From Swiss-Prot:
One of its GO terms (molecular function) is rRNA binding. This is Large ribosomal subunit protein bL9. The keyword GTP-binding does not apply. It comes from Chlamydia pneumoniae (Chlamydophila pneumoniae). It comes from the Bacteria.
Length: 169
C-alpha cells in the first residue's frame, strides 16, 4: 500500500521539494525517510509544504538566473580537438563526452555527465558541432566543439609510401 509523503528535497524521477507524492512503503522506509528526503504527510505538513514551496521558488529563480548567465558565457567558448585521421580523413576513434568534459575543465568550465541530454553522444567526424547542454531550471545551452585533423600522422604515412616507391623504382 502506497504512502503519501511530503518531499523535503528534489528527488529525480519522483518530484521536487514541497511536492506531495505517493511512494511504495519499502522505498519510503529504506530510502526516503532515512535519507531525510521526505516526511510522512499529515495535518501539520501543510505549513511545511507552503514554506518548502516558497523556498523552492526563490531557489529556482536564482538557479535560472545562474543558468542563463552560464549559457550566455558558453556561447563564446570553442573547444578544439585534434585527432588522428587516415589519408581519407576518417577518424581513429571518436571525441566522447568524457573528452569534452576534460577539455572544458582545462578552460575552467566544469561540466558533469548529467549536463548532456544525449549521454552516449560521440563525435565521429571532422568539423564543427554544436553540443546541446541541459542546465538547471530547463535552461539549455550549446557548446561549440571543433574537431580538426592532426596532419602529422597523415604526413608520416605519406612519407612512408614515398620512400617505399623510391626504393622500388
Amino acid at each position: 500500500m502506497k504512502q503519501q509523503l511530503l518531499l523535503l528535497e528534489d528527488v529525480d524521477g519522483l518530484g521536487r521539494s514541497g511536492d506531495l507524492i505517493t511512494a511504495r512503503p519499502g522505498y519510503v522506509r529504506n530510502y526516503l525517510i532515512p535519507k531525510k528526503k521526505a516526511v510522512i504527510a499529515g495535518a501539520g505538513t501543510l505549513r511545511l509544504q507552503a514554506k518548502l514551496k516558497e523556498q523552492r521558488l526563490i531557489q529556482a529563480a536564482a538557479d535560472k538566473a545562474d543558468s542563463e548567465r552560464i549559457a550566455q558565457a558558453l556561447k563564446d567558448i570553442v573547444l578544439e580537438f585534434q585527432v588522428r585521421v587516415d589519408p581519407d580523413n576518417n577518424m581513429y576513434g571518436s571525441v566522447t563526452i568524457a573528452d569534452i568534459i576534460a577539455e572544458a575543465a582545462k578552460k575552467n568550465i566544469f561540466l558533469v555527465r548529467k549536463n548532456f541530454p544525449h549521454a552516449h553522444y560521440a563525435i565521429k567526424n571532422l568539423g564543427k558541432k554544436n553540443i546541446p547542454l541541459k542546465l538547471k531550471e530547463e535552461v539549455t545551452a550549446t557548446l561549440l566543439v571543433e574537431v580538426t585533423s592532426d596532419n602529422e600522422y597523415v604526413t608520416v604515412l605519406a612519407q612512408g609510401k614515398q620512400t617505399e616507391e623510391n626504393q622500388e623504382g
